[in-house]
């Protein structure tokens, strides 16, 4: 999936920003979180997050649920490189495995457990 954030900001600017963030906040992970385009779930109010390295994927999902005011009975799925990451995984390990060449970790979310054409 194409990232709107990548489309709106040139690579050099993104890379410089991620490097600055990592230098200033070594214990935090720069994350870009965007909705899967064709999903009917609510759009998040901000894309950029600075998450603690020891946060789990499940805890991050909780943060996203709160930001989009998702009711408890509704499902949400997050994807990293089009794959559902393990809920218990630490954001730091997901970052090390999947960070983009610009230094950000790109996460997409959807109300459906499918990726691509819905």
Swiss-Prot record:
Membrane disposition: Lipid-anchor
Post-translational modification: The C-terminal 2 residues are removed by atg4 to expose Gly-116 at the C-terminus. The c-terminal Gly is then amidated with phosphatidylethanolamine by an activating system similar to that for ubiquitin.
Cited Gene3D superfamilies: Phosphatidylinositol 3-kinase Catalytic Subunit, Chain A, domain 1 (3.10.20.90)
Family: Belongs to the ATG8 family.
Main location: membrane
Protein name per its UniProtKB record: Autophagy-related protein 8
Cell compartments where the protein resides: Cytoplasmic vesicle, Autophagosome membrane; Vacuole membrane; Lipid droplet
Gene: atg8
Lipid linkage positions (Phosphatidylethanolamine amidated glycine): 116
Position of the signal peptide: none
Phenotype upon gene inactivation: Impairs autophagy as well as the formation of aerial hyphae and conidia.
Residue ranges of the propeptide: 117-118
Gene Ontology CC: one annotated term: lipid droplet
Job of this protein: Ubiquitin-like modifier involved in autophagosome formation. The atg8-PE conjugate mediates tethering between adjacent membranes and stimulates membrane hemifusion, leading to expansion of the autophagosomal membrane during autophagy. With atg4, mediates the delivery of the autophagosomes to the vacuole via the microtubule cytoskeleton.
């Amino acid at each position: 999936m194409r990232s709107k954030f990548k489309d709106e900001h040139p690579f050099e600017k993104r890379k410089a920003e991620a490097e600055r963030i990592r230098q200033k906040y070594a214990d935090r992970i720069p994350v870009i979180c965007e909705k899967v385009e064709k999903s009917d779930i609510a759009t998040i109010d901000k894309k950029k997050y600075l998450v603690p390295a020891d946060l789990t994927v499940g805890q991050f999902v909780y943060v996203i649920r709160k930001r989009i005011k998702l009711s408890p009975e509704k499902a949400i799925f997050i994807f990293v490189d089009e794959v559902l990451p393990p809920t218990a995984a630490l954001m730091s390990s997901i970052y090390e495995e999947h960070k983009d060449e610009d230094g950000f970790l790109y996460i997409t979310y959807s109300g459906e457990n499918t990726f691509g054409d819905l």
